[in-house]
Every structure is written in structure tokens, then in C-alpha cells.
């Protein structure tokens, strides 16, 4: 069951009450990390209850610890030793036995027990938490006090993760949105408003909702919201193996958050492949291997890249991602991101990318790239949105829809700049605005 507005408001108020003097920028890493560990603990407990059939995990572990941990790793991708579950921290607090070293030991052991095939999914995922950090307090006692407050907060009924995946994902999505709102300059760039995500996702999946296999790719994955929203419109998204989630992220914080976000939506680690690297540097996934151009292709590609970013465009003319179209200027990487996405699109796939309006009229190399895309009939539609939809920038943006093997030469322009509601300093798309945009594009 989805969280009510009242529950969300209470949750955020409780969180602010417990953080004390810690800045939200630092606090978010601990809240997300500990919440995710709680999720993994409860998932492991649920799995153990099903396989042990009344036996005690500590007893099984004591008989053959290596075998026990390997069995858990084989099934979950990770393993948790006895007495190192989230509830064990809470029990230690309740009996005055807690110390911050318990958490340090837990995460050290967790990192040692990641399955080889799950390394990309779990490795470094808790690195945002430093238990010796001065952000938490001047001494071990002060830092332990902060951790106790967090653990007790996340043990409250408001943060109960024992319900459906919808409840778990709702909690996580709400917190991501709240932190992105409050920390707009820090996190806003990694968060795409839900309404724009829905527009893109519905266009990308229209007529393909029943596909048994579907691969999606976001090369600037941020919090992972575009991947998740796109998948939510696929009828078989709840079945393991149907959808393969690929993404890439340069910055460490969203790299961690995106993996947490996907898994807390119930997606198994072996359906997730998120890479930590600069998308505009060496190509991924696959790309040129042993001198041969062999990019991995996807059914749907979506992106909300940093707008008009600077990049190193030197000696890029022979890179297969840009060779046919040209190289973007070093002060504006917008078309570099677009062409990277197009390069990884299946011949019958669809892509949607959010860009500043400047890509529609700037000249020089960008004008030549734009002309090449139009001459190849690869731009299907351009949707112009109102200003102030995004948390980190007031500028208006557009969504460009592309297909590779398109025959029609026309380009649909949708002016959606007038349909919105104003909420404080931000503009928001209403449900009727989303419907009108989607209907215009797909019909």
C-alpha cells in the first residue's frame, strides 16, 4: 500500500528531529545506507525463514560457517553473519550494549561476503558512511549517539519494510525526492521529476508493454528513477529476468543510490548492471572491443544528462559514437550524450533524452549534427516543457524522441510550455498535462 501524505510528512519530520546538528548533505548518506542495510537484513531473514525451516541461523553457521555463508551468497548475492542483522543493532541498543564498532565490523564482514557475480551490484555501496567522520561528532561516544538515533528512527513503524515492495519503494522514492528538493544544488541534478519521467516512459514503452524480454539503458543514471519509471509500464516487470537494467554514473553518491533504489524496488541483483565511470570517456557497455566496434544495444534508452556540460572533445572524430555525425563542442556536451544514447539503441528501439532548448537552434558543429539527425529521419518528436520544472535549474527543457530506422521525414513539435500548475517557486505538470502530451505523441 502506498504511503499517505500524512505518513510522509511525519516521516520527514521525524528524520529532521533526529539528525541534530548534522548537515543534510552528510546525513543523507547514512540514512540511505542504513535503510538499505535494513532492507537487505529483512530480505535475508525472510529467505532464511524459508530455507532453515525452524533451524537457527546461528546454529547452522556455527556448524560450518563457510558453507553457510556461501549458500546465502549463492542465493542472495551477499551474506550476513549471525548477530550482524539490523535488528541485532536495535537489540544491542535496547540492552545498552551498542557501540559504533559493531557497525564498522558489520560492513567490513558484508564487503567480504559479496558473491563474485554480484560484485558490481554491492561493492562500495556503503562507502558513503564513515563511522569515524567528524560530521557525526567529535568523539566515539558522540558518533555512537547519532547512530543510535538513526537506528531507532528506522526501527519505528513509519519505516516498516515488512510490507509489499510497493511500500518499500515508496519510502525510498519519497526520501530521494525530499532530499533532492531540500538539497537542490547537490542532489537535484540526479533527480528527474516524476511527471517528465512518466511522459518519457509511456512513449518509450507504448505498444511494447507485453514484451517478454526488454532491455533499458540510462547512461547518466542518477538516482535510477528513469529506469524504474520506464520498467513500471511493462506488464511483466515483476518477473525476474524479463527486464535488464543498465546504467552508468560518474559521481559516487548517485552511483550508490541508484543501485540501492533498484534493489529496494525488488529488482534482483542479476538483472542490474550499473557502471561507475564517465559516459563520455571510454564507451560502455561493450563498445569497441579488441579494435572491433561491438556496442551493446538496448530496446529503450533514456537520459537526463547534465545540461551544456564541458567535456574533453579532443581527438574524438574516430570514436564510433560520433564518427557519422560530428563532435560536440567542448563547452556543450549535449549532442555528445544524445549520440552516445543513439549509438546504443536497437534498430527498432526508441530513445528519449532531456536537453536544454539550445540544442534546437545553436549552430556550428551542433547545427551540423542536428542536420545529420534530421536527414537520417531519426528525430521523431520534440516536446517543449515549461520553465522551473527541475529542482536544480529554472531553465525550460525539451525531450527529444528518436528512432534509428525511421522512414518518415516529419518531426512532431509539441508545445507543452503552457500546461502546468505553479506550486511555490516550482512549476509542476498535472496529470491532465501528462495525458495530453503522451496522447499527442503516440496518436
Residue ranges of predicted features:
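Non-catalytic, mostly N-terminal accessory regions of nucleic-acid modification and defense proteins
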Residues: 1-204, 208, 270-279, 384-387, ...
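Short alpha-helix immediately C-terminal to the canonical SAM-binding loop
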Residues: 227, 253-257
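Conserved class I S-adenosyl-L-methionine
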Residues: 211-220
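A conserved structural/catalytic subdomain of Rossmann-like adenosyl-cofactor enzymes
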Residues: 2, 281-282, 286-443
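S-adenosyl-L-methionine
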Residues: 257-293
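Conserved SAM-binding motif I beta-strand of class I
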Residues: 244-249
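Conserved hydrophobic/aromatic pocket- or pore-lining residues that grip, position, or stack substrates
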Residues: 171, 200, 219-222, 230, ...
